[in-house]
Amino acid sequence: MKQYLLILFSIFSFPYVWGDAIGTWKVYPSYSDASDIVPTGKNVFVLASKSLYSYNVNDGSLRTYSNNDVLNGCNIQNIAWVNAVKKLVITYSDYTIDLLSLNGDVENISALADKQTTDDKNINSIYVDGQYAYLATGFGIVKVNAKDATIADSYNLGYKVNYCYISGNSLYAASESKGLMKCQLTANLLNKNEWTSAGDYKKQNKEKYVYDSTNKCYWATDSDSKLTKYQKEGDTYQAVSTGVKPDGPEYNEHNYIVYDNGRILSVRGRFDYVSFDTSTPGFVQEYAIDSDTWYCYDNSYSMDKGKNCIAQTQISVDPKDKNHIMVAAKSGLYEYKDRKMIAYYDMNTDDPILSVINKVNYSVISGTRYDASGNLWMFNMGNDNILCLTSAGEWKSFNQRNLSKDDSYRLKSLFFDSRGLLWFVNDSWKAPLFGFYDIKSDAMRVVSSFTNTDGTVILEKKNIFAITEDRAKNIWVGSETGCFYITPDDVNAMLSVDGENTNVRPTQHKVPRNDGTNLADYLLSNVFICDIKIDRANRKWFATSNGVYLISSDNNTQLAHFTMDNSPLPDNDVRSIAIDDNTGMVYFATLNGLCSYQSDVTKTYGDLTDDNVYAYPNPVTPDFTGDITVTGLTEGAQVKILATSGQLVSEGTSTGGSYRWNGCDMKGKKVASGVYMVNVATAEGESGIVTKISVVR
């Protein structure tokens, strides 16, 4: 094999090209808030922000663990080391249990999660005795045999157990509601009557510094949440190592994300219209994709002025300066430059922003968007004016009779379409509507009558959350009961009528059943849709309360439905989607974490050139099992892959700017080792280019 590979490369010159294989996932967990540190001798395991990593004491290396590699879940609640069998017990918020060995093998116990019961199955803490792990749960105690990965016993006590332990010959259950209860180990632990009171409940406090008996030291996290080694000198602890932790976001909460200039920008959201909740401060995070590095934006400007930054909901990037962004929030408008806040605007600053009616303590900027000239447009809840902060720094107001000071108008999800119209939705069930503002004519058009082309009322007192334009210039709208779109002709009709347009009939797409009945079903009917994004192939990505749906360009085929059950999604409630059109990477934001999926659609090019067209991975090594991707193609490019003998092994049309080959010939058989020629021509067949793929079996 090695000799063949050497001969192959001596004949043909192949740059080693690798990209993320189509269908692969990445997760981006936070490690900022350590809750458990577990020394095991060679390794120190750390549970931080519901994610797991380990530090190798001998070589100083870090390893992360996730549901994208070895683990069977995410949102970890507890960890504990069972030294007798050298396994780490991991419990999750969905009540599943993993047993992780030092070699990376994982055994899963799903019996508790699978148990059909109305009891509270939440696992509050773990106590280890010998080869057994005792789980304190919402209904009692579960005894796990870590040696053979089974549940040995389950003691339903009928009340929440905060923690448990063994002392002497008794098992103790500490409960906030029942106090401290105990039962002799030789008694019938299944019998609730055998459990007797042993005193009052005392809260269990975790030690900040965890002693490592093997390495004769203490472990804790420093002020930057980094794992640090300490030695105790008298009553004080002295750091004797530099702190370490994996890179990641500060928080796992991602309510809104946007792709811009090779980075993902994220805000936490948590917008509560009812109360002015300050428990979730605003926070901007940036992921630099090429360097795989996370940055946290500096909010000290507002903090120094005693101004709370609350519930940031939308990010707008200045088209003239990518390092200048504006963020809409429940507490006003925030301006950042070079990852630092430099200004904020609200009802108390010199601008036309108003406070929410009857709530004078805060002002809501519900949505923002820059136009191509660098002017920032925004809606201010409780204000019947559209506001604009020009590129010169001048504030302007445009009164609109379709707006109201009523707090039922929460206009958001702003974007400019291909015509230059500023679209928005109102996510209040009191007044569901969508529409646009024409900045050239200072005219607003809205649709609040939602009767579809069949004459059926499709929205009545329902929330609308998402709006976007597809590549056929249809405007798609997502609500808590599904999706619909209006056509370019509908938009023209809206432009021809002043004010509210009741003649527009949104289209609910019908998907044929193809079962001989001539019946059809509405696309994603009764699905709660939070966001919609369109990729280069005009496919629709829907973020919903039940995962992510990918729908074909003709809207008739569900190409994928990702959930926590079949993907590394950290939560089924997906709030936002961002697409890197250059690479085809699709990012999914949830309040429990961020992840990405490598799709098969990339940027399309105007011409076929040697610089743009290439295949990856190249060479295709024996251990590779995915699809090979040819990228850098024009829209609708015709692709033929041939062996050196001239035999055709694959042909087809590009999807977006890429073409997928499964490495098989026309009969579905894996091709042999060799060099394969990729002939590419435009959709019109007017020009072509050849690249090569090396396959090594």
What are the functions of these language-model segments?
Residues 585, 672-677:
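Short, conserved beta-strand segments of beta-strand-rich sandwich/propeller modules, principally
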Residues 3, 18-613, 648:
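Carboxylate-rich, polar loop motifs that coordinate divalent cations or form catalytic acidic clusters
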Residues 638-649, 668, 676:
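Short, glycine-anchored, charge-dense loop/turn motifs used at functional sites
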Residues 648-671, 682-686:
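Glycine-centered tight-turn motifs at strand-turn-strand junctions
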Residues 1-4, 697:
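Positively charged n-region of N-terminal signal peptides that target proteins for export
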Residues 4-13:
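Sec-dependent N-terminal signal peptides
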Residues 677-697:
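C-terminal tail/sorting-segment detector
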Residues 607-640, 658-661:
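Glycine-centered coil/turn sites that cap beta-strands in beta-rich domains
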